[in-house]
Amino acid sequence: MKVAILILSILVLAVASETIEEYRDDFAVEELERATCAGQDKPCKETCDCCGERGECVCALSYEGKYRCICRQGNFLIAWHKLASCKK
């Protein structure tokens, strides 16, 4: 009886672990797309579809050494400075 409970517990944990891993992968992709405007290398605009109503699309230097549009909520002046420097 104890062996059956142990095997059943291991099976439940394995299924739960697989489900969590799939959800984590989906979440990481969604967050990356939202943060980088789906990875599009286009000039930044005042707003982007991926930023929502309150977000702004601003330019930031990525680890690859390229400027990318990212969604930003926060300091208005910093956001506008980044927009201006990205359009050069």
Swiss-Prot record:
Function: Inhibits voltage-gated sodium channels (Nav). Causes scratching, lacrimation, hypersalivation, sweating and agitation followed by spastic paralysis of the anterior and posterior extremities and death at dose levels of 1.62 mg/mouse. Insecticidal to the larval and adult forms of the house fly.
Keywords: Disulfide bond, Ion channel impairing toxin, Knottin, Neurotoxin, Secreted, Signal, Toxin, Voltage-gated sodium channel impairing toxin
Disulfide bond sites: C37-C51, C44-C57, C48-C86, C50-C71, C59-C69
Subcellular location: Secreted
Tissue expr: Expressed by the venom gland.
Propeptide cleavage-removed residue intervals: 18-34, 88
Main subcellular location: secreted
UniProt similarity note: Belongs to the neurotoxin 03 (Tx2) family. 04 subfamily.
Record has Cell cycle as a keyword: no
Cited InterPro entries: CNTX
GO molecular function, one term: toxin activity
Top-rank taxon: Eukaryota
Domain notes: The presence of a 'disulfide through disulfide knot' structurally defines this protein as a knottin.
Range of residues in the leader sequence: 1-17
One cellular component term from this protein's GO annotations in UniProt: extracellular region
Name of this protein: U2-ctenitoxin-Pn1a
